[in-house]
């Protein structure tokens, strides 16, 4: 993160601390953002770190920790949301990508909309070739990230402990279904 570069961009776009109180304003209106999150491991701390970084930029931010961000997410009553997702609960990218990045996606709380992404999602929905599906998923991800509408902050490490009699229990960085048909106890 380039703090000085961010400050310069804000200034170039007309954001200044016109009254010397440390908070940027534009056209007389102070920049104040609300961050919502919930109590899952690492999220409150990440929200506080984000709040601190915004403060260093001259942006006032408050953090509200909720039981769940889902209702507020659907209503769109927030400025920034810090939440966690299991990205591939089905082992296939379509569900996650469509729900998160599709214009009408059920988890598209930021109201992201990109016609090119929607077209690629439409193609992904009917494509059966696994290589082409993987390529489409990568292209969708690249396009969304290039639009700067999402910021992935961290990946939570998961740990597993088991007896030495358990075989075939695989850990995945993108899934929570660890027990498969290959999992057994000797």
What feature does the model see in each segment?
Residues 13-37, 84, 128-163:
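Bilobed periplasmic-binding protein-like "clamshell/Venus-flytrap" ligand-binding domains
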Residues 3-7, 13, 37-50:
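Bilobed "Venus flytrap"/periplasmic-binding protein-like clamshell domains
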Residues 52-101:
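Periplasmic binding protein-like
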Residues 7, 51, 55, 94, ...:
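Generic hydrophobic alpha-helical scaffold/packing signal
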Residues 42-45, 91, 161-162:
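Short, solvent-exposed loop/turn elements at domain surfaces
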Residues 30-39, 61-64, 79:
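Short, well-ordered beta-strand elements
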